[in-house]
């Protein structure tokens, strides 16, 4: 299982259910990388999707303890149930939000992290993989600048 997330310099990922600074290059990378895959997403993150619509060209699994019905999403009540539902799928990505990342990180072996080199007001953070002994930065796929903000798309793998 893999995950994909954009983080700021302090590993912040969001504020009040949204990304304070969203780069179009990161969104393009997200779409390209997750297309045709299964995505596991939390209820609050789905609430930030336009019209709460499922992501196109992906199997969408909603991870929620609540009995939530959202058209286009399959419901899993636990990380283990989400894993069982996606067993056999070629690629499975955890796409947030903060609670889902924390629950699913121990089950992931690879992480695509877009490091956005700035800070923004955040109330949600991703664990700093540079400080975790069981994760290693293996590759930088892309570096760039957008609207005066530099970024790096990095790959981390579990040791």
What is each residue range found by the language model?
Residues 1-159:
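Enzymes that bind and transform nitrogen-containing heteroaromatic metabolites
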């Amino acid at each position: 299982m893999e995950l994909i997330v954009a983080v700021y310099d302090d590993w912040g990922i969001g504020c009040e259910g949204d990304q304070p600074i969203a780069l179009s290059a990161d969104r393009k990378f997200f779409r390209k990388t997750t297309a045709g895959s299964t995505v596991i997403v939390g209820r609050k993150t789905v609430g930030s999707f336009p019209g709460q619509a499922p992501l196109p060209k992906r199997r969408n699994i909603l991870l929620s303890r609540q009995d939530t019905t959202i058209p286009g999403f399959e419901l899993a009540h636990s990380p283990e149930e989400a894993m069982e539902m996606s067993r056999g799928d070629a690629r499975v990505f955890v796409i947030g939000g903060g609670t889902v990342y924390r629950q699913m990180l121990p089950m992931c072996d690879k992480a695509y992290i877009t490091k956005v080199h700035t800070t923004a007001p955040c109330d949600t953070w991703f664990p700093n993989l540079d400080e975790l002994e069981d994760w290693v930065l293996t590759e930088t796929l892309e570096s760039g600048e957008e609207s005066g903000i530099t970024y790096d798309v990095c790959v981390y793998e579990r040791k």
